[in-house]
């Protein structure tokens, strides 16, 4: 699984039983947040709070305003975690694997519809790279 020159893998996020991330996700989060360590910590705490809900509730989390199914995506079906009252309007796109585990794919700030379109394309490219593993196996 390669994006650019790097091997792309899925990593389990410590502290959760069913939450994973594409290996590139932490860097995308940090790039989105910029260099302000205080802001990084604050938004990471917020994200982890909602990842705990996602870990516990699975698909039922979609009943909450922080979670949404991206209707324009059917194959694959993508989902997003959103921070409704955030000043930076950050979003985290993920997918369900086998209906149970969630895999975080990308993080971005939504300033316009084009930002969402770009992030969806990015998430699909990451997913494609994950599915096309070097050993011929898929997710």
Regions found by a protein language model. Give the residues of each.
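Basic, Lys/Arg-enriched alpha-helical interface segments
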Residues: 1-89, 98-102, 109-139
């Amino acid at each position: 699984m390669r994006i650019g020159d790097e091997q792309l893998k899925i990593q389990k996020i410590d502290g959760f039983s069913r939450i994973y991330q594409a290996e590139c996700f932490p860097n995308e989060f940090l790039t989105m947040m910029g260099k302000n360590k205080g802001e990084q910590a604050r938004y990471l705490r917020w994200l982890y709070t909602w990842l705990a809900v996602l870990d516990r509730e699975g698909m039922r989390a979609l009943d909450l305003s922080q979670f949404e199914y991206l209707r324009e995506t059917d194959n694959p079906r993508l989902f997003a975690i959103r921070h409704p009252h955030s000043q930076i309007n950050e979003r985290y796109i993920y997918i369900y694997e086998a209906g149970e585990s969630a895999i975080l794919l990308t993080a971005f700030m939504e300033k316009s519809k084009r930002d969402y379109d770009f992030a969806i394309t990015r998430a699909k490219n990451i997913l494609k790279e994950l599915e096309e593993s070097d050993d011929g196996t898929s997710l």
